[in-house]
Amino acid sequence: MFEKKLFFVSCQALKGEALYGKDIVVKLAKAAIQGGAQGLRTSQIKNIKALIRANFNVPIIGIIKQNYPNSDVYISPTLKEMKKLIKTGVQIIAIDATLRKRPKESLNQIVDYFFKHKKSHQLLMADCSSIEDVNNAIKLNFDIIGTTLRGYTEDTKNFSNTDDNYLFLRQVLKICQQNKKYLIAEGGFNSPQNAKDALDIGANAVVVGSAITRPQFITKMFYEKINS
């Protein structure tokens, strides 16, 4: 898929956040690439299109964050978002692949639509939270498995990707190797050492987001440490 191990930076600025506004995501992405990022992840159609137009010549993971009243699933949760993402031509489309109740179509229906309508270069990434999610995503033939939602679901809220010397990541890696799937470590890799560890353990790529591109998160980490 990709010949070398990649370091992705997630560049997102959502409505209500201080950095939300025109061209901000492109500037964040440019700064990330100047610092060594080899791939990008972003949300919302206008940002995806802007990064594609910027022609950074790196792989881009695109998502749409959309809340629905009857479900906790918000990362590219329905066919509506999938159709929009395919249309952008973004190389990697990531969707929530957890086994939680979805707002509309089933995960199977969304995946089936992707494989029937995708552009030839497009790949599908499963944002997972548990081993059950991973096994189901492999059964559905996702191209890429991500640990993105570990710690961000009700069932995994007391766990993280870095717990017990990266035990979850190691378990997912074994499954991915057995099934010849590309593994992206994402979710809570908030230090350079965490990111290096993920790649050293065997992940094909690592995504770092808040710890690089969200000043409020970085400031909060400092503040809490200072006041602990």
Swiss-Prot record:
The protein's Enzyme Commission number: 5.1.3.9
Main EC class the enzyme belongs to: isomerase
A GO MF label: N-acylglucosamine-6-phosphate 2-epimerase activity
Pathway: Amino-sugar metabolism; N-acetylneuraminate degradation; D-fructose 6-phosphate from N-acetylneuraminate: step 3/5
Keyword field contains Transport: no
Record carries keyword Isomerase: yes
Keywords: Carbohydrate metabolism, Isomerase
Reaction equations catalysed: an N-acyl-D-glucosamine 6-phosphate = an N-acyl-D-mannosamine 6-phosphate
GO biological process: carbohydrate metabolic process; N-acetylmannosamine catabolic process; N-acetylneuraminate catabolic process
Residue pairs linked by disulfide bridges in the UniProt entry: none
GO cellular component term, pick one: cytosol
Function: Converts N-acetylmannosamine-6-phosphate (ManNAc-6-P) to N-acetylglucosamine-6-phosphate (GlcNAc-6-P).
Family label: Belongs to the NanE family.
Descriptive protein name: Putative N-acetylmannosamine-6-phosphate 2-epimerase
Species, as recorded: Mycoplasmopsis pulmonis (strain UAB CTIP)
